[in-house]
Curated annotation (Swiss-Prot):
Keywords: Developmental protein, DNA-binding, Homeobox, Nucleus. GO terms for molecular function: DNA-binding transcription factor activity, RNA polymerase II-specific; RNA polymerase II cis-regulatory region sequence-specific DNA binding. It comes from Tripneustes gratilla. Residues 42-101 bind DNA. This is Homeobox protein HB4. Pfam families: Homeodomain. One of its GO terms (cellular component) is nucleus. Belongs to the Abd-B homeobox family. SMART domains: HOX. CDD domains: homeodomain (cd00086).
Amino acid sequence: INIFMKKNCKCISFFIFFSIFFCRGREAEERGHANWLSATSGRKKRCPYTKFQTLELEKEFLFNMYLTRDRRLEIARLLSLTERQVKIWFQNRRMKMKKQNRAQNYP
């Protein structure tokens, strides 16, 4: 019973410690203060692509899996996206295709 109590106390202590610091991080974030626990504060909010943007990106991907920088800039301008968004979309799409091919080859 003593060993059981010690293990539980350690778990509970860790939980309390984590909860206190997590809550403090949340409070500071709500007040607008930077905190080491609020790593997401520097990230932009996720914005899903519109159906039109996705359709155009998919069409371009079917035509060419790899884009030149000029083409990437052109697509970004046409779809009102950043060059980085287009670049990452194509990277993610290539990985998706790779996973699909792997799943088909090894059912």
